[in-house]
Amino acid sequence: MALGALLLLLGVLGTPLAPGARGSEAEGQLIKKLFSNYDSSVRPAREVGDRVGVSIGLTLAQLISLNEKDEEMSTKVYLDLEWTDYRLSWDPAEHDGIDSLRITAESVWLPDVVLLNNNDGNFDVALDINVVVSFEGSVRWQPPGLYRSSCSIQVTYFPFDWQNCTMVFSSYSYDSSEVSLKTGLDPEGEERQEVYIHEGTFIENGQWEIIHKPSRLIQLPGDQRGGKEGHHEEVIFYLIIRRKPLFYLVNVIAPCILITLLAIFVFYLPPDAGEKMGLSIFALLTLTVFLLLLADKVPETSLAVPIIIKYLMFTMVLVTFSVILSVVVLNLHHRSPHTHQMPFWVRQIFIHKLPPYLGLKRPKPERDQLPEPHHSLSPRSGWGRGTDEYFIRKPPSDFLFPKLNRFQPESSAPDLRRFIDGPTRAVGLPQELREVISSISYMARQLQEQEDHDALKEDWQFVAMVVDRLFLWTFIVFTSVGTLVIFLDATYHLPPPEPFP
């Protein structure tokens, strides 16, 4: 048994190690050698006055959202930090050809690059992944991050707006005399002065379209963050984005236009229908609800008024005036000769001159045509012949019932009363017949007064119709011109063709 165990042990020791095992052992020995005297808190500069160059790149994975109310942009990104640490260099030939190592981020010096304009107090990255160290001493770190950065929103042309949001990265504790920043590098080693977007993995936002994505290195004149004096460098990544307005066109602007059309056609609704005021107030309340719903989407700022709010206020003013003017039209429609006397200028303008220009034409009253009698009655008494002659040759209906002529003086109008009250010898009628004719004259006067009353009332109703039609065309013109002026102004608000003109 002892001999067998000895032979087994010799066989195990004599078996060659797998290449992976030798590699792991070589990596362990290399890491142990590199970090034997390594201090992660010491800046990797050969001399005190040397600057450590750090390149900062940004890969955008997703533009999550832009909260206009809180002026906050949420993004999912990958930072791309690269610098040189001379203490982490080696000769691959001396270490089984190992040319790179994966080391935990806590083990090496980091340039403490943070997002300065964060909006939630989280300056750091989301996950401290390993750094990749090459044999030349180049260190590359690509941590992912979910950032909420502040973004000043320009609301003037909302929802036809574009925004310029920035992400400002800098070394928080080192100034430019210790750490030199520059924009990220592309695979060829050239500076990439823009945000990198991988087309295969990028998730497009449904509300915003990225127009430009440049980056720029700036140097602040003096320490603006407090502490010791010195210059600080910052790498700023710009996201110039344009809103896709389809959602607001369908859900806000189109309903507002339809409600405005309802308010316009209030003036086409006859006053007798009794729904003019109800329809106007309904449109006004609906616009108020739209304004309240939109208030949650717009930033609470007094610097500018969004164009969509301007349009809603313009529409609300029109609808408010439609309510007021509907009251005016109803007041005109229900006037009568007992309460109001129509001025001469009102009659001239709204009855005679203005209607043809508005497409209105008042129908002419039809005159009753009475056939002339073709037979004569035989006289039966002495006075019957005179009576027969009177009824056969009766005056025309215009004499018994004078047509309404509101421009003719009352004294000049023919009147049956003067015919009755005239000299008896001119008529030669008995007293009984005169009493009958007097009664007929009284009824004629009553019918004439009623006809005058109805005619004057119809005049007021026609004036109300003309005013209604005038308001209809006025509102159509104002609504069309106002809508075009407001929204055509937004068509000229386009993102710049170049990010830095």
Curated annotation (Swiss-Prot):
What cellular-component terms does GO give this entry? acetylcholine-gated channel complex; neuromuscular junction; plasma membrane; postsynaptic specialization membrane
Tell me which parts of the chain lie in the Cytoplasmic compartment: 333-469
Q: Which residues lie on this side of the membrane: Extracellular?
A: 24-244
Q: Which SUPFAM superfamilies match?
A: Neurotransmitter-gated ion-channel transmembrane pore, Nicotinic receptor ligand binding domain-like
Among the GO biological process terms of this entry, one is:
regulation of membrane potential
Q: How does it assemble?
A: Pentamer of two alpha chains, and one each of the beta, delta, and gamma (in immature muscle) or epsilon (in mature muscle) chains. The muscle heteropentamer composed of alpha-1, beta-1, delta, epsilon subunits interacts with the alpha-conotoxin ImII.
What does this chain do? Answer: After binding acetylcholine, the AChR responds by an extensive change in conformation that affects all subunits and leads to opening of an ion-conducting channel across the plasma membrane.
This chain belongs to which protein, by name?
Answer: Acetylcholine receptor subunit beta
